[in-house]
Design a protein with these regions (language model features):
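A composition/biophysics-driven feature that prefers long, compositionally simple stretches
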Residues: 1-213
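A short, terminal or domain-edge coil/loop segment
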Residues: 43, 116-131, 218-222, 243-249, ...
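Signal-transducing coiled-coil linker helices
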Residues: 43-46, 226-234
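Hydrophobic pocket-lining residues that define ligand/cofactor binding sites across diverse proteins
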Residues: 58, 225, 242
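Short catalytic-site patches enriched in acidic/histidine residues
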Residues: 74-86, 187-201, 229-289
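Conserved short loop/turn motifs at secondary-structure junctions
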Residues: 164-167, 221-230
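Active-site pocket-lining segments that scaffold enzyme catalytic pockets across diverse folds
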Residues: 211-218, 231, 239
Length: 289
């Protein structure tokens, strides 16, 4: 039997998936350092909550496992992250079997890093892997076939080989190899969205911190906006502000001025702001996922 299936899965209790709301107080904007005199975000508690939510959503579905290539879903289930460059490569993935622990395939050095620094994951469940890199690696090399057969073997050992697996996003050649390995593919994104829909108190605290950072960014814009400043100048200032305050993904800063405001182009240029211009800004960023 595969080593991954020998050890008992981590048991998530009802208390683990208690969101711990306290609506009798205002939502806190917590500091980001760990301190001994205040309870702040408990990241291990948040991991167990998220894993429990995903497991419960999986149990409520007709799926035998979830196969996740979406970076947001991978982070939700495993509490792991590498650089933003990997977000669109579709070459890290997680398999969550019904009643089991998440198994993560990542770039080789990242997998070793997870074994050292992510003790909430079983070391043997942090595996090196590579598939298509969005077509960069030709399927003829056999990497997709290898990993599809590997996952089929794991699901057989987990007792769910005949049940469909839910996938969030996937390269077509990888899906074809999974089907050749005898697996039935269904939509798993809706199952994950149902799991992620209800936020815990820890997640809400992080959302509030992210919003506070954006509040500060808008105040910076208010201070810096004047004739002669270019749209891209504002974008650079806001990116610096957010990353200095701990943002892990500034997805976009829309900075639009003057005649560019209508119709909305959804990007920024080097246009210089002039007196009396209408201006529009939109900030998309995340803090701790």
């Amino acid at each position: 039997m595969d080593e991954i299936t020998r050890r008992d899965p981590v048991k998530v209790t009802a208390e683990d998936i208690n969101p711990r709301y306290n609506w009798g107080r205002h939502l806190p904007v917590l500091g980001t350092m760990g301190v001994d005199f205040e309870e702040r975000v408990d990241y291990r508690r948040m991991h167990r909550y998220r894993l429990g939510r995903a497991q419960a959503a999986l149990e409520a579905s007709d799926l035998g496992a979830l196969l996740l290539f979406d970076d947001n879903n991978i982070r939700y289930v495993t509490s792991t992250k590498i650089g933003e460059w990997a977000r669109d490569k579709l070459s890290r993935w997680t398999l969550l079997p019904r009643g089991g622990d998440p198994i993560l395939w990542d770039f080789g050095s990242a997998a070793v890093h997870h074994r050292l620094y992510s003790p909430w994951l079983k070391p043997e469940n942090c595996k090196a892997g590579l598939v298509g890199l969005r077509g960069t690696v030709d399927p003829a090399f056999g990497l997709m076939k290898h990993h599809a057969e590997e996952m089929a073997s794991i699901l057989k050992a987990a007792g769910v080989p005949k049940m469909p697996i839910g996938v969030d996003i996937i390269e077509p050649p990888m899906m074809f190899e999974l089907e050749k390995a005898g697996l039935k593919i269904k939509d798993g994104q809706q199952v994950m969205l149902e799991a992620r829909e209800v936020k815990s108190a820890d997640e809400i605290a992080l959302l509030n911190r992210a919003a506070a950072m954006v509040d500060g960014a808008y105040h910076l814009i208010d201070e810096e906006l004047k004739p002669g400043v270019r749209e891209n100048d504002i974008v650079g200032m806001v990116n610096e502000f957010l990353y200095r305050h701990g943002s892990d993904d500034v997805e976009a800063i829309n900075a639009i001025s003057g005649e560019r405001c209508n119709p909305h182009p959804h990007n920024f240029t080097d246009r210089m702001v002039r007196p009396g211009d209408q201006v529009f800004f939109d900030i998309l960023q995340s803090f701790m996922g």
